[in-house]
């Protein structure tokens, strides 16, 4: 029973589906046929509506030429106006009853033709050509104002450069001081004139103390100094005191002399000096002088100072060497 019922349901469903398909196909076919039938009517209605709209517009604008072309049915009138048709679209439109009253409107195109020819003959240009006598008359007064203008123009031109020259005059003294700084390097030539100099060093005790005379005497003798002229010590070319003196040692306290018996002697320091030029090589003598000062300072517990009694520096030593070279070059 279940199988029979299922088979019946399948058959009924298939029949229903086929019926639906046939019904849909038939309805679509019917709609298409009705659309094709209604199209020519719609086209005719649309054409009529367009023609009626064009006629209304033409009536509003009052165009005479279009009305003439569309109203004429006679062959004689058609031949006269065929050449003047501006738009071929009106030939295919059927004449309607509304176009019949356009016949009396043929007068406006005829009235338009005469005004076109009327402006052509009117040429008043020939009359001013016949006036040659008036042209030379204005030329003569034109020459007269030209001459005073030319004469007045150069007057301000000459007056303008005069203040310009005055402006350049104060500029001249500005250029004058320029050669003045050129003369400044002239004093540089004074350096070669130095043909002699004195190199000074000091060996001093520390601040608030003094050098012991006995230690000072031993250190001076070890450095090669010998007591001699002016009651001071001298360093000669040879350690035994023979030969010329290279540099000398004096007391820092005035009058700068020494007493050979210096056991009970004290002093804040001693001064070593060398006169340039001297015997032999001055630079080598300067090195020997510096070594002697350092030896004495180490022995007595003092320090080496420059000529200003300041701590000796490498820059000051180079300055001493430059002075020695300068004096040597001046004495060549």
Swiss-Prot record:
One GO BP annotation of this record: FtsZ-dependent cytokinesis
Free-text function comment from the UniProt entry: Essential cell division protein that stabilizes the FtsZ protofilaments by cross-linking them and that serves as a cytoplasmic membrane anchor for the Z ring. Also required for the recruitment to the septal ring of downstream cell division proteins.
Species the sequence originates in: Escherichia coli O6:K15:H31 (strain 536 / UPEC)
Oligomeric form and interacting partners: Interacts with FtsZ via their C-terminal domains.
Full protein name: Cell division protein ZipA
Transmembrane residue ranges: 7-27
UniProt gene name: zipA
Pfam family, one: ZipA_C
Membrane topology (Periplasmic): 1-6
Record has Cell membrane as a keyword: yes
């Amino acid at each position: 029973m279940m199988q029979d019922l299922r088979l019946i349901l399948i058959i009924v469903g298939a029949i229903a589906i086929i019926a639906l398909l046939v019904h849909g196909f038939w309805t679509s076919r019917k709609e298409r046929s009705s659309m094709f039938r209604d199209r020519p009517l719609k086209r005719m209605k649309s054409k009529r509506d367009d023609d009626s709209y064009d006629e209304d517009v033409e009536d509003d604008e009052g165009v005479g030429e279009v009305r003439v072309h569309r109203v004429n049915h006679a062959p004689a009138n058609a031949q006269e106006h065929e050449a003047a048709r501006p738009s071929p679209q009106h030939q295919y439109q059927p004449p309607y009853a509304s176009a019949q009253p356009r016949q009396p409107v043929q007068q406006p195109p005829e009235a338009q033709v005469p005004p076109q020819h009327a402006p052509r003959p009117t040429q008043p240009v020939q009359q001013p050509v016949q006036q040659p006598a008036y042209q030379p008359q204005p030329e003569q007064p034109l020459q007269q104002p030209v001459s005073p203008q030319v004469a007045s123009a150069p007057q301000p031109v000459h007056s303008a450069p005069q203040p310009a020259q005055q402006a350049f005059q104060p500029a001249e003294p500005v250029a004058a001081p320029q050669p003045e700084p050129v003369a400044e390097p002239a004093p540089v030539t004074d350096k070669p004139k130095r043909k002699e100099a004195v190199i000074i060093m000091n060996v001093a005790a520390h601040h608030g103390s003094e050098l012991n005379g006995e230690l000072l005497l031993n250190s001076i003798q070890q450095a090669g100094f010998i007591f001699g002229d002016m009651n001071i010590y001298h360093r000669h070319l040879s350690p035994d005191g023979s030969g010329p003196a290279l540099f000398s040692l004096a007391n820092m306290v005035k009058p700068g002399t020494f007493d050979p018996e210096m056991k009970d002697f004290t002093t804040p320091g001693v001064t070593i000096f060398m006169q340039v030029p001297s015997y032999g090589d001055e630079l080598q003598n300067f090195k020997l002088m510096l070594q002697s000062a350092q030896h004495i300072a180490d022995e007595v517990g003092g320090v080496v100072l420059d000529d200003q009694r300041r701590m000796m520096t490498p820059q000051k030593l180079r300055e001493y060497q430059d002075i020695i070279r300068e004096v040597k070059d001046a004495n060549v």
